[in-house]
Design a protein with these regions (language model features):
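A conserved hydrophobic secondary-structure block that centers on an alpha-helix together
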Residues: 113, 313, 317-321
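OB-fold/S1-family RNA-binding modules
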Residues: 106-109, 155, 256-273, 277-278
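Basic, low-complexity terminal or inter-domain segments flanking catalytic cores
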Residues: 2-4, 163-167, 187, 191, ...
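C-terminal or mid-to-C-terminal helical accessory/interaction module adjacent to the motor/catalytic core
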Residues: 90, 96, 103-104, 149-246, ...
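Metal- or metallocofactor-binding catalytic centers and their adjacent structured scaffolds
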Residues: 163, 267-304, 311, 478-481
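Intrinsically disordered, low-complexity regulatory segments
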Residues: 1-188, 486, 497
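Structured, non-catalytic alpha/beta "coupling" segments that mediate domain-domain communication
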Residues: 30-67, 220-269, 367, 425-472
Length: 630
């Protein structure tokens, strides 16, 4: 019996073949660059000893497009919302290799990434195989389930395959068709509109990226977040406020210490109100210590690592873009060093042997001794569990040890070290401390002072990306004692504007609002940057994302049109689509139903956009004029 196995990437194909064959394969070149065919034998429990060929694709091998008669300029853009589509083979040599190898295969086993996109690529592989072997169908094609390249895990995946998830295939097909129809129709509409405008066209020539005004159902809500924050910063008007502060001079360990107390009411924007309270306070030369509370406190170790948290932390800690972080994680996964990096799961399965993974890291000079403490000194703790489980992959974690000096570049080193340290922190105890809170009553008002003493750093000893330090020790206050007020003052402050958008904030907003998935968020940010809709700028060492003139004009233009029951710049419609796609996966609705409903909404928006194109152009012109005449 012959079994054809197909992976999503050449590196995965090579690694899986090496494991299943016991490092004994016959390698054949193909006409497709980077792709090899590996021949070997493997004993499948249900089939016995089989001849196996392991090969791969390089992502998608087909895509959907419109027939030639619907190409740019040959039909009105609005026609694309209901025009026929056709499937096009985008990688002919890869497609033909699968078809040739499937000709003599009895069974097809899919080894693509275990997510929706991987499921659809598996379907594409099946279609290529059926070209020469119609006996291969969705009812008998096998699908391996794996999340990393550890030997026993791969052997288990080979021996316990499932079937393709056809609902996931339909969900991806639905998303691809909607992205094509909506993206192409609006892109052609906007581009034609702006090219015909002398003002817009002259401005766009400054940046070749802007010659095509590309629209995407995820990119525009993402851009909308950035524009919204920019406008909040720009329109911010600072307000004065007033508050009361108190300092007590105390002797502490032989030294005079000034202890600041904070007003429990915070601050007020009414100066007269605060003045009256302050006058009542200063009539009392003494204050009374009403409470002294000492209680244990903890700084919780992190939850197991998800894709979104990986991207946010790499942006915050290493100033690395979300795309660069995910690309580095993908390379580490392909090399077998970490688990699959696209996951929403923040809880480890109970049956997973985490101590074995810790043991593999014991040889490292940086964190090896810490691993030994976890394993041999009773410091290991079961990781906390979050609320999310995508049922496909565990949290991101190290699978095999990698010496940092052997990794190709700094980004790989930083991401690998972060993944390892995060994992070890998850398996550690929370940091422990004591929080000392003193309450002072001055007149009728209450003020508090706090002091933190860190007793045991625990996970913080291996996780340097978070700071939790002891504050200056508070003197020994006694409950009920009176103290002379040495520094009671009424002070003035003013409100500060919000900061412009940072990439970690943007990732969090996209995740919370259902814009894209954990796996595609980075790509959407990259696209709006590459298309010239936003620019990145550094201020005082922090990188912010600001809208360009074009990005601002597009969002404000769509907002001025005031669509009925829809917004092209807000996240609601895309979030609704993502929820509908999940319903397709769950079997609660159909691809056809979702297509009908969503296309109808976008059709209404398209008609209004076409009718009110002058509003879009005017919004862009207003932005240019305001920047030229500030």
């Amino acid at each position: 019996m012959k079994i054809l196995c197909v992976a999503e990437k050449p590196s995965i194909s090579k690694a899986v073949a090496k494991i299943l064959s016991g490092e004994s394969t016959r390698t054949r070149k193909t006409r497709a660059k980077y792709i090899m065919n590996y021949d070997f034998k493997f004993n499948f429990p249900q089939y016995g000893l089989c001849d196996v060929t392991m090969t791969s694709v390089v992502g998608h091998i087909t895509n959907i497009d419109f027939p030639p008669e619907y190409s740019w300029g040959k039909c009105p853009p609005g026609r694309l919302l209901e025009a026929p589509t056709l499937e096009v083979v985008s990688q002919q040599d890869v497609f033909k290799n699968i078809a040739n190898e499937a000709r003599t295969a009895n069974i097809l086993m899919i080894w693509t990434d275990c997510d929706r996109e991987g499921e659809f690529i598996g379907w594409e592989i099946l279609q290529a195989a059926r070209l020469t072997n119609p006996s291969l169908t969705s009812e008998n094609v096998l699908r391996s389930q794996f999340s990393h390249l550890e030997r026993n895990h791969i052997l288990h995946a080979a021996k316990n395959p499932l079937l393709l998830d056809l609902n996931a295939v339909k969900a991806v097909s639905c998303r691809m068709e909607l992205d094509l129809r909506v993206g192409a129709s609006f892109t052609r509409l906007l581009t034609d509109l702006f090219r015909k405008s002398s003002v817009a066209n002259a401005s766009m020539d400054k940046d070749k990226k802007s010659n095509v005004i590309s629209y995407g159902t995820c990119q525009f809500p993402t851009l909308g977040f950035i524009v919204d924050r920019y406008l909040r910063v720009k329109s911010f008007v600072s307000e004065k406020f007033w508050y009361i502060s108190v300092d007590l001079k105390m002797e502490n360990d032989g030294e005079v210490q000034l202890v600041p107390f904070t007003w429990t009411r915070g601050h007020f924007f009414d100066r007269l109100f605060v003045t009256l309270i302050y006058q009542d306070c200063i009539a009392n030369p003494f204050g009374k210590i009403t409470k002294v509370i000492r209680k244990p406190t903890s700084n919780w170790r992190p939850l197991p690592l998800t894709t979104v948290e990986l991207q946010k932390d790499c942006a915050r800690i290493f100033k690395m873009s979300a795309k660069d972080a995910l690309d580095a994680a993908e390379k580490l996964y392909n090399k077998g060093f970490i688990s699959y990096p696209r996951t929403e799961t923040d809880q480890f399965p109970q049956a997973m042997d985490l101590k074995e993974l810790i043991g593999k890291q014991s040889q490292d000079t940086r964190w090896g001794s810490y691993c030994s403490e976890l394993l041999h000194e009773g410091k290991y703790r079961t990781p906390r569990g979050g609320k999310n489980d995508d049922k496909a992959h565990p949290p991101i974690h190290p699978v095999n040890y990698a010496n940092l000096s052997a990794l190709d570049n700094d980004k790989l080193k930083k991401v690998y070290e972060y993944v390892v340290r995060r994992f070890l922190a998850c398996c550690s105890d929370d940091a422990k401390g004591e929080l000392n809170t003193v309450t002072l009553q001055w007149g009728k008002e209450e003020f508090t002072a706090t002091g933190l003493a860190v007793i045991a750093k625990n996970y913080l000893n291996v996780y340097p990306y978070k700071k939790w330090e002891s504050s200056k020790k508070l003197p020994n206050f006694i409950e009920g004692e009176s103290r002379s007020i040495t520094g009671g003052k009424m002070k003035e402050g003013k409100t500060s504007p919000p900061n412009h958008m940072t990439e970690p904030e943007l990732i969090g907003l996209m995740d919370a609002n259902g814009i894209g998935t954990d796996a595609t968020i980075a790509e959407h940010i990259f696209k709006i940057t590459n298309r010239g809709y936003v620019v990145k700028t550094k201020q005082r060492g922090t990188e912010y994302i600001l809208p360009s003139e074009l990005g601002m004009g597009l969002i404000q233009g769509f907002d001025r049109i005031e669509f009925e029951n829809i917004s092209l710049s807000k996240p609601f419609l895309r979030k609704r689509l993502e929820n509908s796609l999940q319903e397709i996966v769950d079997g609660r609705t159909t691809k056809e139903q979702v297509l009908r409903e969503v296309i109808q909404l976008y059709r209404q928006a398209f008609v209004q956009s076409a009718q009110k194109g002058n509003i879009l152009l005017q919004a862009y012109k207003d932005i240019i004029d305001s920047n030229n005449n500030p």
